[in-house]
């Protein structure tokens, strides 16, 4: 079943890298992009997003705060924090929020593993 994936990153280059990998891995799924947390929250609240990939370092609301806000309304949505900042504290906070963590630079294998797990999780929720 095709899903809609939201990529939230203030860096156009980072969004392009993720989009390129995404199209190689899941060409049948839909990818939508957001440049900041406020825009992402609007998109998520519309209910049209199944999965989210969220950058940690963004102006205003950071990625972990965005995950926390999404969790309040959509506790089962598969979410991953995508960041070059691989400090244990950040990875730990992501896990506390029941979010995955994908290090940058992004690899196809890491993205594929997360998306496969997300698809299984959504399938379980639907049944």
Feature names for model-found ranges:
Residues 65, 86-102, 113:
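Alpha4 helix (beta4-alpha4-beta5 surface) of REC/receiver domains from two-component response regulators
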Residues 42, 64-75:
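Short amphipathic alpha-helix used as the core "switch/output" element in two-component signaling
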Residues 8-9, 34, 52:
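Conserved sequence signature across two-component system core domains
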Residues 33-42, 63:
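Helix N-cap/capping motif at the beta->alpha junctions
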Residues 58:
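Receiver (REC) domain active-site loop signature in two-component systems and cognate sites
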Residues 55:
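Active-site residues of response regulator receiver
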Residues 12-32:
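Two-component/phosphorelay signaling modules centered on CheY-like receiver
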